[in-house]
Swiss-Prot record:
Gene3D superfamilies on file: Ribosomal protein L9, C-terminal domain (3.10.430.100), Ribosomal protein L9, N-terminal domain (3.40.5.10)
NCBIfam families associated with the record: L9 (TIGR00158)
Descriptive protein name: Large ribosomal subunit protein bL9
Lineage: Bacteria, Bacillati, Bacillota, Bacilli, Bacillales
An example Gene Ontology biological process: translation
Amino acid sequence: MKVIFLQDVKGKGKKGEVKNVADGYAHNFLIKKGLAVEANASNISALNGQKQKEKKEAIAELEQAKSLKETLEKLTVELSAKSGEGGRLFGSVTSKQITEQLQKDHNIKVDKRKLELPDGIRALGYTNVPVKLHPEVQAVLKVHVKEEA
C-alpha cells in the first residue's frame, strides 16, 4: 500500500515522502497514529500544493535576507564604552548590545545569535562583524566603538 508520510518514521521514510509499505503496517500503525495518510489522488495533489507553498516561502525568505544584507552593509552601528590605556575596553561589547543599538538607531531587528562574534569586541575603533542572515546569505555589519566621555 502506498502512503504519504506526515512525519519522519525511523527506518521507513521522511516527512512528505511517498512510499510503499505493507497494508497491515499502514492501517494498524502509520495511519492509526497519524504518521501517514493513504496515497490517493487528492492527498498527492495536496502534498504537491504544500511543496509548492514551501518552495515559494523559501524563495521569499531568501529574497528578504538578501535585501536585509544590502541594508546592513550600508550601515554603521555606533556604540560607546569605557576604555583604558591603548584603546582597550573595560569588558567587551557583546552581540546583544550591538543588536539593541541596531534596533534603537535604525529600527532593524536582528537576532543576536545571528551575529558571529564569539568573544565580543574588546577594542575601540571599527570592527566588521559577520551576520548570518540565511544559510546562503551572510552580511558584514560595521560596528564603531567610541570612547565614552
